[in-house]
Amino acid sequence: MASQGTKRSYEQMETGGERQNATEIRASVGRMVSGIGRFYIQMCTELKLSDYEGRLIQNSITIERMVLSAFDERRNRYLEGHPSAGKDPKKTGGPIYRRRDGKWVRELILYDKEEIRRIWRQANNGEDATAGLTHLMIWHSNLNDATYQRTRALVRTGMDPRMCSLMQGSTLPRRSGAAGAAIKGVGTMVMELIRMIKRGINDRNFWRGENGRRTRIAYERMCNILKGKFQTAAQRAMMDQVRESRNPGNAEIEDLIFLARSALILRGSVAHKSCLPACVYGLAVASGYDFEREGYSLVGIDPFRLLQNSQVFSLIRPNENPAHKSQLVWMACHSAAFEDLRVSSFIRGTRVVPRGQLSTRGVQIASNENMEAMDSNTLELRSRYWAIRTRSGGNTNQQRASAGQISVQPTFSVQRNLPFERATIMAAFTGNTEGRTSDMRTEIIRMMESARPEDVSFQGRGVFELSDEKATNPIVPSFDMNNEGSYFFGDNAEEYDN
């Protein structure tokens, strides 16, 4: 978190380490993913999964969810105290899909959480390996970001569906730590804060007493995380106002919504990491790859390279398009749900289409879906090029205050122009500049008005051939100027909350 004055790289956040040099970071991230891989292999053995079944992404997700549930301390404590009908709080499980007589069958499995924790620790040299758990949470979050649109959640908190590109990480659990905070979008943080303020408005005791003190500390911490994402002094000053408010109410909600809107042009810095399904790490470990010795990075060539040589399968419903299912998972793997489609298409080497044109539903299969007609296909997760993941938000002048990309939160550090219709956005900023934050609001609006659509973000940055692991020869793509590529626009994707 920027606000504590230590700038750690995402990998350090990911592995819980303090300042390390590049080699140490690569080694500790390598240790983390190899632990995930070893755990996955062990679970496949326990469940007697065939090689093919072990490469099925739905099985991977079930196994990942089991270990996340086994380590969810707060929920486990809650479940112990509130026994629900027919659910054993000490057990966890889910659907495992097996191939029987040329058909896929669903089998519900149940395990002791204690047993799962033992297998996980054993795979991670006896440690709890929280970093590995967070890594799995981020993979699930990235998958949700690519699959669902959070328009309902946005509207409920008084925000606008057009802000969907600010919603990265909106389904991350609270316990995802610093690595989780780094990847949350501005809209996600604003939404969490608004929910908190609304509770305070409705519940007199929310800020009071011993509990209230803890609530207040959490509130200020979230404000600091959000402040650290903004890159202009005026936006940060407004966050100080929100944080220092005696008892936060509607004025603060107004300020937060204003800030969220402003982030459509004055982009926040949001980290992007390629987090892959556990089965991918399992395959690599099983084939004898030594992650710890070789080192690994979530923001460089390594995930691309891993996906080039991994064969992962997915169940496909009768009228789904396997190529579209592949695109969904590819986007999730590279945390590219909010990237410009022109950039994604160039890197992937095949056209990436908007969410509304995908003939595919989510990756997970509901328990009431009929397995009879289920088929399975290979997911095409390879790419033509690779590119470095960014956290800058794509603002142009000195990466500070200027036009970011509307409806896009850049994932890759690749040069692109910023086609956007400023009028549409500025229309949201009519009137209300009075109140305590008036001078900051005026300043923010001034910066937004001077943002030029013809600017170029990530000047001179390009993609790299997969053989160019040291990133020596950038290839700078040229894009069609007037064609902006937002994944979610004009879309009727399923809602996450359904």
Curated annotation (Swiss-Prot):
It is found in: Virion; Host nucleus. A motif (Bipartite nuclear localization signal) lies at residues 198-216. GO terms for molecular function: RNA binding; structural molecule activity. Late in virus-infected cells, may be cleaved from a 56-kDa protein to a 53-kDa protein by a cellular caspase. This cleavage might be a marker for the onset of apoptosis in infected cells or have a specific function in virus host interaction. Keywords: Capsid protein, Helical capsid protein, Host nucleus, Host-virus interaction, Ribonucleoprotein, RNA-binding, Viral nucleoprotein, Viral penetration into host nucleus, Virion, Virus entry into host cell. GO terms for cellular component: helical viral capsid; host cell; host cell nucleus; ribonucleoprotein complex; viral nucleocapsid. HAMAP family: INFV_NCAP. Encapsidates the negative strand viral RNA, protecting it from nucleases. The encapsidated genomic RNA is termed the ribonucleoprotein (RNP) and serves as template for transcription and replication. The RNP needs to be localized in the host nucleus to start an infectious cycle, but is too large to diffuse through the nuclear pore complex. NP comprises at least 2 nuclear localization signals that are responsible for the active RNP import into the nucleus through cellular importin alpha/beta pathway. Homomultimerizes to form the nucleocapsid. May bind host exportin-1/XPO1. Binds to viral genomic RNA. Protein-RNA contacts are mediated by a combination of electrostatic interactions between positively charged residues and the phosphate backbone and planar interactions between aromatic side chains and bases. This is Nucleoprotein.
